[in-house]
Regions:
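Charged DNA-binding/catalytic regions of mobile-element recombinases
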Residues: 1-273
Length: 273
């Protein structure tokens, strides 16, 4: 219109109105409704799971019924600036200790790993958490949250879990005072449970629980400021259930811990003659 009205060239007309010349040749791309809905899904996913990247977004999209491949999700994820901020890498310690494969379970309820984790409420008071996972299924069996937890508290958690799942064959933990206490030793002896103590200063020997701890802190503890012990217990228990039900693991063929455990038990049920 400007060219015809004022008799100027295409270059002059575009420069005057600040419009790229390419817009005169290529029609604007119409975004299909399906792609727009997919982008909305990815944006909502990134807000709900701020520490999960495009790979997990692609897996979740397919679990929710989207017919998409990784390449497309990656393109849209980066196009809309949904990248997860890179974490600073810590220097890894090296040492000699028990190889993690020396005791790798081949079925559920063989080996439970235990460890403590700490945080605070907004008033600065300590939150102490006892995390328990099944190393085979990767299920988080418990995250027990208190201000303090002693050996008797550990025994109470083990009693509760054994009542639901039965006692394990082994417990793996470090040499913390709560774990080496006589109360825990008595519980293990009474329930015929063996103990595996990792070497002092060797957290990599308890690799699965350390991996869980890292994800737990990255995906929840670093994002929340708890107002009270009660609030912490409610939110952390919700996270534990969500982790078991909705977090796929590559080692399990992208099944969640609960799905993997259910699948294993179904496939290994005694056959009725």
């Amino acid at each position: 219109m400007l060219r015809e009205r004022f008799g100027v060239s295409e270059r002059q007309a575009c420069r005057t109105i600040g419009q790229p010349r390419s817009t005169q040749r290529l029609p604007a791309r119409v975004v299909p409704d399906e792609e727009r809905l997919l982008v909305e899904f990815l944006i909502a996913f990134s807000k709900q799971r701020p520490r999960w990247g495009w790979r997990r977004a692609a897996k979740q999209a397919r679990r929710d019924g989207w017919d998409v491949n990784d390449k497309r999700v990656k393109r849209l994820w980066r196009l809309h600036g949904l990248r997860v901020p890179a974490k600073k890498r810590k220097k890894r310690l090296s040492g000699i200790g028990t190889h993690i494969g020396a005791m790798s379970p081949i079925r559920p309820n063989v080996l439970w790993a235990l460890d403590f984790q700490f945080d605070t409420t907004v008033d600065g008071r300590t939150l102490k958490m006892l995390n328990v996972i099944d190393e085979f299924t990767r299920e988080c069996l418990a995250i027990d949250v208190h201000r303090t937890i002693d050996a008797d508290g550990v025994v109470n958690v083990l009693d509760r879990l054994a009542h639901v799942h039965g006692p394990p064959v082994y417990l793996r933990f470090d040499n913390g005072g709560e774990f080496i206490a006589q109360a825990v030793a008595d519980w293990c002896r009474f329930n015929t449970v063996n103990t595996i103590f990792i070497d002092p200063g060797s957290p990599w020997q308890n690799a699965w629980i350390e991996s869980f701890n890292g994800r737990f802190r990255d995906e929840l503890l670093n994002l929340w400021h708890f107002d009270s012990l009660l609030e912490a217990r409610v939110i952390i228990e919700d996270h534990r259930i969500d982790y078991n039900m909705n977090r796929p693991h590559t080692a399990h063929g992208d099944l969640t811990p609960t799905e993997f455990a259910d699948k294993w038990r179904t496939e290994h049920q005694p056959q009725v003659a």
